[in-house]
């Protein structure tokens, strides 16, 4: 297996630190709003990567954090006039609702920043003792010039860097790029006791501490969106390696950004399309298929029209599966040369820097062959193709492996029948019943539109 390591900029053979075990950390959301498709991309990508590692026989220990104290959470709480913890608790619950709808398997650990404050304080103290951090009247900062490998991950030199949009401006700092480890409390903000007075952790130290405490001083994979390479991941790496003197993460994986309406999808700009809306309108597998059809390191353009096309393609596969399952699925296929050929192609694709577009295309090829085998009465191959879709490759990709989409297909079929009944009633001028059907559907979020070419519907 070979993956592109952001640290080296090269495609490298993947060799875990401990044979047979993979320890990985994926940066999770800051919980102050519903997650959008941009947030869904790393969630889906690294959910599937974890599944594939398990398919290949590794035991995976996966950590995905929740940042549950942050300026954005505090600002949201102030806007709503509620406690910041209520904001975080609410949107962690909403995250799980959306993650479940999207078929994201829980990680082994989902730590919250606020559960690790004592550990964070302890590690900041060690960084201060070792000369990598210093105190000012506004808090504690990491001295980037003391860490000689700063910029190694992002390929940036300190001499070329200037304070940018995500670098805190503070005249009390020794150097503009020094970043906050501990923020002195402001009136009305959540705070904790520390040797430097009441305050709260900086953003970057949170992930360093949670990953080191759970996975150890060195682990295999650190992953997230490419927008996190600098400053977040660069700063995480600097803190951890200054603390331990060891390599923090052996491999760094980063997914490309999602572009929507010509720009990066981002909550801070309001340029978003929520996962909840996407799944409700176009289905779980439609969104997962869209994400996996692009190589994880490439940028991904998003639009409703594109998502609609992916959703339609998924529904065609579900219709093939439904036809096969309607006759009752029994038996286990033979492990023949056709089976071996497909497994080899699937593994070859995902072993090559996690090439999900090729892996997904194999799944759709199998669906086409399943349909053809049913038409030809080839029961042996039909069972084999079905098995590979539903029982083997589908569960790795998180596609066609649950029954929720079948219920969606059944729901659409039922809706089509209701529309036909309503059209018949209208032709018979039985408007009381036809209007009753229309109104009941509207109450359930389905809007009917009568056009010259027939009745169309949309989902609110």
UniProtKB/Swiss-Prot annotation:
One GO term of the biological process aspect: cysteinyl-tRNA aminoacylation
Quaternary structure, from the entry: Monomer.
Protein name: Cysteine--tRNA ligase
Regions crossing the membrane: none
Known cofactor(s): Zn(2+)
Reactions catalysed: tRNA(Cys) + L-cysteine + ATP = L-cysteinyl-tRNA(Cys) + AMP + diphosphate
Chain positions recorded as ATP binding sites: 267
HAMAP family associated with the record: Cys_tRNA_synth (MF_00041)
Biological source species: Thermotoga neapolitana (strain ATCC 49049 / DSM 4359 / NBRC 107923 / NS-E)
Entry's cofactor comment: Binds 1 zinc ion per subunit.
Superkingdom per UniProt: Bacteria
Main location: cytoplasm
